């Protein structure tokens, strides 16, 4: 007998499956997710924990007319399987395959593109309001994880949704990793009662009665508070009720039959409602359920039988691990140093700092804006905070970087993990913009280490600097260099990484870890008789204009390389320096290599670097073209 899952090519097919068979379908979906994530990596735990919610939603609502908006998208693997992408699911997070997150261009069932947290409620409210304006039929549901509820924008959306009173359904998928629910016999009893027609009919009848009494609105408000008072005492819903939502729950988020029944009732409810569903992250897969730290949050390839990562050949440590070790050394030597992250203790490596220095390591939740201003407050009182956040997520705190830190010249260090191209996580997670959006901030020192030692030196330098500083480093392994004791670098001074005797044909200025590819390109060019010098600028701001302009002027041709956006980035900084020094008027030939004006999709990092033209082959080709073009025109 074949799988139920193989009969489902759309939500319409799912609706034909009897409710009694849905638990078996959920098990098949779990098995498919586990097998695929073992091969491709991905957000296993969140998706396993939300299978029943996915199935019940699609069984009751009618996507794409009804809009299902997934916060972050970690929970949406089952959604992809149920919406015509079953066969393509094996390609998820691979080159040319499905994205790891919902994307509007991928399917009409992906109502909103996501990847960053806490946005679903605001987006869903916009959709339901658009339906009101246009008269288009359909329901809108936002599915939000409890972790996303630590983000302020989620409550901004709740606040307006409650005020407007639209028929918005918010499903809070609480996997007990952030929120501690108030559960028990009374809570369970109230959950059933508050979702029932009887309870809501009673509320409506009381209201209708009071409206016939003079000064009814005031009386209604008094009685409404009385009705809700007992409920608020025994459920965690008081906050949501206070924001204008009708609260239902907690309910068992793995009881798919019960969820179908509840969604059927809530689909006809008038007004904003929040359903609180308790789930288990990693549900149905013991290795994920038993991982108390992350429960299979974001995994690379793993062995299905054990849940353990598939070991690749031994190599250099990841930059993330090296940063964490260097930070712990700094914290050990200087009690003023503290570490801050936004719900990414594991991802940024700060779990090591938390274990060694629990009272000086802060996880503020998905609250990047708060993290930066919290750091600013600490810095005001003599503390040396290090804010470790993925490059893509620090974008959310840009105003705080400028207004709360840089404007006041506070000594806050920003450690930007995942700077540059990130691989399988794709468009929403690329760290492409940091060099551009940071280098324009007055007084902010911006550093890009080319190897592990440079990372250690730059962290140490930032903590000795009396002002704001940022260092960005990539995802993945380091270069494998022997580690040196950390030392203070002279701010604004780069180094000549490769010199040649006499007059060079071309100079390559390579920011950060693009230095390795630049050196490889220079060696390949040397074999062809093309002499190339290579500069490691170290600092994107302040730029070492003396060194860079001197080497560019010596060669008369220069290629800049960065793993960041070309618009406003490191290459632009060099162009500005060349302009100031009169090198452009003197005929300097310039080529800039970096990420073009587009969002780079998911693939292996090496392939992405080849796509955008910053690998060794592309750098060598750019140098050849520049040298050949100049010689063809008779320019020395």
From Swiss-Prot:
Designated gene of the protein: dxs
Biological classification of the source: Bacteria, Pseudomonadati, Myxococcota, Myxococcia, Myxococcales
GO molecular function, one term: thiamine pyrophosphate binding
Binding positions (Mg(2+)): 146, 175
Record has Oxidoreductase as a keyword: no
Pfam family, one: Transketolase_C
Protein name: 1-deoxy-D-xylulose-5-phosphate synthase
Keywords: Isoprene biosynthesis, Magnesium, Metal-binding, Thiamine biosynthesis, Thiamine pyrophosphate, Transferase
Cofactor names: Mg(2+); thiamine diphosphate
Entry similarity comment: Belongs to the transketolase family. DXPS subfamily.
One GO term (biological process): 1-deoxy-D-xylulose 5-phosphate biosynthetic process
NCBIfam families: dxs (TIGR00204), PRK05444.2-2 (NF003933)
Catalytic activity: D-glyceraldehyde 3-phosphate + pyruvate + H(+) = 1-deoxy-D-xylulose 5-phosphate + CO2
Cofactor stoichiometry and binding remark: Binds 1 Mg(2+) ion per subunit. Binds 1 thiamine pyrophosphate per subunit.
InterPro entries documented for this protein: Dxylulose-5-P_synthase, THDP-binding, Transketo_C/PFOR_II, Transketolase-like_Pyr-bd, Transketolase_C, Transketolase_CS
Subunit-structure text: Homodimer.
CDD domains according to UniProt: TPP_DXS (cd02007), TPP_PYR_DXS_TK_like (cd07033)
EC id: 2.2.1.7
Top-level taxon of origin: Bacteria
Pathway per the UniProt entry: Metabolic intermediate biosynthesis; 1-deoxy-D-xylulose 5-phosphate biosynthesis; 1-deoxy-D-xylulose 5-phosphate from D-glyceraldehyde 3-phosphate and pyruvate: step 1/1
Cited function: Catalyzes the acyloin condensation reaction between C atoms 2 and 3 of pyruvate and glyceraldehyde 3-phosphate to yield 1-deoxy-D-xylulose-5-phosphate (DXP).
Binding site for thiamine diphosphate: 74, 115-117, 147-148, 175, 285, 368
Species for this entry: Anaeromyxobacter dehalogenans (strain 2CP-1 / ATCC BAA-258)
CC annotations in GO: cytosol
């Amino acid at each position: 007998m074949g799988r139920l899952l193989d009969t489902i090519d759309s939500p319409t097919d799912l609706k034909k499956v009897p409710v009694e068979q849905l638990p078996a379908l959920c098990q098949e979906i779990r098995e498919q997710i586990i097998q695929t994530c073992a091969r491709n990596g991905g957000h296993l735990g969140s998706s396993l924990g939300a299978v029943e919610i996915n199935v019940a939603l699609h069984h009751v609502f009618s996507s794409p007319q009804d809009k299902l908006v997934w916060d972050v998208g970690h929970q949406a693997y089952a959604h992809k399987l149920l919406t015509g992408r079953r066969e393509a699911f094996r390609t998820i997070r691979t080159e040319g395959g499905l994205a790891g997150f919902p994307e509007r261009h991928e399917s009409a069932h992906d109502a909103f593109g996501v990847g960053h947290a806490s946005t679903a409620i605001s987006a869903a409210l916009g959709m339901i309001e658009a339906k009101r304006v246009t008269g288009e039929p359909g329901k809108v549901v936002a599915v939000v994880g409890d972790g996303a509820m630590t983000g302020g924008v989620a409550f901004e959306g709740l606040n307006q949704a409650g005020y407007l009173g639209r028929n918005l359904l918010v499903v809070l998928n609480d996997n007990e990793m952030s929120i501690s629910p108030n559960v028990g016999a009374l809570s369970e009893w109230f959950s059933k009662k508050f979702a029932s027609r009887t309870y809501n009919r009673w509320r409506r009848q009381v209201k209708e009665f009071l409206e016939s009494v003079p000064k009814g609105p005031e009386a209604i408000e008094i009685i409404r508070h009385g009705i809700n008072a007992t409920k608020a005492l025994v459920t965690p819903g008081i906050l949501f009720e206070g924001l204008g939502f009708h609260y239902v729950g907690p309910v068992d988020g793995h009881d798919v039959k019960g969820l179908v029944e509840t969604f059927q009732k809530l689909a006809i409810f008038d007004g904003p409602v929040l359903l609180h569903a308790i789930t288990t992250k990693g549900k149905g897969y013991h290795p994920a359920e038993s991982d108390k730290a992350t429960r299979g949050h974001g995994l690379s390839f793993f062995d299905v039988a054990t849940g353990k990562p598939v070991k690749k050949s031994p190599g250099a440590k990841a930059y993330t691990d090296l940063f964490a070790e260097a930070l712990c050394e700094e914290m050990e030597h200087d009690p003023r140093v503290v570490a801050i992250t936004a719900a990414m203790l594991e991802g940024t490596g700060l779990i090591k700092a938390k274990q060694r220095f629990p009272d000086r390591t802060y996880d503020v939740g998905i609250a990047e804006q708060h993290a930066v201003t919290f750091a600013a407050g600490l810095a005001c009182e003599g503390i040396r905070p290090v804010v470790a956040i993925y490059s893509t997520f620090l974008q959310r705190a840009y105003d705080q970087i400028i207004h709360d830190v840089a404007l006041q010249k506070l000594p806050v260090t920003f450690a930007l993990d995942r700077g540059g191209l990130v691989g399988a996580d794709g468009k929403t997670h690329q760290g492409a913009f940091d060099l551009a959006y940071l280098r324009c901030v007055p007084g902010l020192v911006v550093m890009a280490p080319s190897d592990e030692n440079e990372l250690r030196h730059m962290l140490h330098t930032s903590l000795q600097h009396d002002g704001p500083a940022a260092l960005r480093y990539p995802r993945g392994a380091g270069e494998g260099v022997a580690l040196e004791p950390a030392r203070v670098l002279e701010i604004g001074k780069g180094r000549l990484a490769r010199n040649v005797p006499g007059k060079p044909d071309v100079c390559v200025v390579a920011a950060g870890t693009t230095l390795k590819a630049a050196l490889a390109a220079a060696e390949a060019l040397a074999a062809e008789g093309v002499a190339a010098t290579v500069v490691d600028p170290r600092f994107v701001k302040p730029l070492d204009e003396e060194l860079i302009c001197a080497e560019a002027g010596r060669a008369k041709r220069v290629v800049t390389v960065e793993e960041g956006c070309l618009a406003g980035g490191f290459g632009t900084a060099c162009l500005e320096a060349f302009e100031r020094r009169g090198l452009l008027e003197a005929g300097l030939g310039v080529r800039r290599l970096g990420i073009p004006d587009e969002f780079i999709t998911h693939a292996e990092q090496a392939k992405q670097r080849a796509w955008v033209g910053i690998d060794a082959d592309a750098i060598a080709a750019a140098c050849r073209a520049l040298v050949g073009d100049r010689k063809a025109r008779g320019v020395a």
